[in-house]
Amino acid sequence: MMVTYTTVAVLITIFAIAEAKPKCKTFSQKDVVCTAGKTDYQLVRGLVSDNNKTTGITLRACRIYDIEYESFNDLNSLSYLDLSQNKIQNLKLGVIDEPKQLSYLNLSYNQLTEFPLGLFDQVTKLDLLDLRGNKINKLELGIFDPLTKLNFVDLSSNALVGKDLNPYIFDQSPHITFIDFSRNNMEGSPDNLLHAFQSLQILNLDRCFLKEVPSFATKPNLGTMKHLILSTNQISKLDNPATFVNLDSLELLDLTANVIETINPNIFSPLKNLQKVDLKNNIMKTIPDDLFRNMPKLISVDLYGNQLEEVSVNVFRGSPLKNLNLSSNRITYLQDNFCLELRNSGGKIKKFLFDPNPWQCACLHDLLKEVKRLGIEYNKGKYDGKRPVCVTTAEFNCKRQQNFNEMYIDMFNDVKEIHRNSRSA
């Protein structure tokens, strides 16, 4: 009877291990893709190891909580390894030493907090390192030193504190072209944090608790940068005309969802390659008359969700503007023949979004006639008769004077309130 019980226990154990083990399939004799078993799993040698033909391994969401030594032994052709969306809390020193041809390593969305110094010493060909969505709060000086070929680094959505980062952390990785710090606290980071970079193109600082444009993001060595993302921070003003003077190659500047109220009229002047500026969801009441003037490559400006009451054609004069968004401001009128004047002053306007705003009906009528006549795309779906889009007095003509603005804005807010109440009644 004891033998029977022992046999049953062994069978149950074997069955449990089999149930926990991810199921793997090989495609084209070189790409291994695994799916999760029914319980959490400790990765050990034998599941994906010992195959010199394997070039790619995907262990995404396989409920892996730990990786044992030799799990990746004898994978001399492996270049792609995806361990994302697991439950890994730490990586032991030496655990990824074997696949020396590795160029892509995805460790995103695990529970990592830090790395032992030397972890990457043997994978010197890494080109892409994805660490987003972990709990990393510390980067040991020297951790990236072996990664001289690193090109893409994603550190977003971790627990990094910029003021605690060593400014020499990337000194041996000068060829990084993409780095993402978004959803970390980067306020107070060292001014020379990125001083080693020689060819950075994209820097993402979204949701980084920044109160101003950080100086580490605008240094002279970053003249190669094409995209600078500063959205969803606490930047309140752009008053220094020299802020972006070093960023000659910049094509996209995203300042969405800050608290910007004032902008120096010359702040964008050095950006001769700028194509798109996103300033939506700030609190600007006015914009300088020459803010976007004579910018030879500027084609898109988004000013949605500010508090603008007046926007002059002069703001864009001499720029080849194609797309303009003025929706959700406090605009009751635009100057007569606004779109035609844009085109006559160098613009190539093709798409113009201007609703909702507290329009005077006569002014909106003139604008709609103009965009239709010129074949300009606009948000026509807003004009379905289901909600108020403008207000008028008995005198139906467009009053293009600022002193009338408050009256029409108040009227529009009253009409919206009445409409809201009637729908909820």
Would you name each region that the model predicts?
Residues 2-425:
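Extracellular leucine-rich repeat
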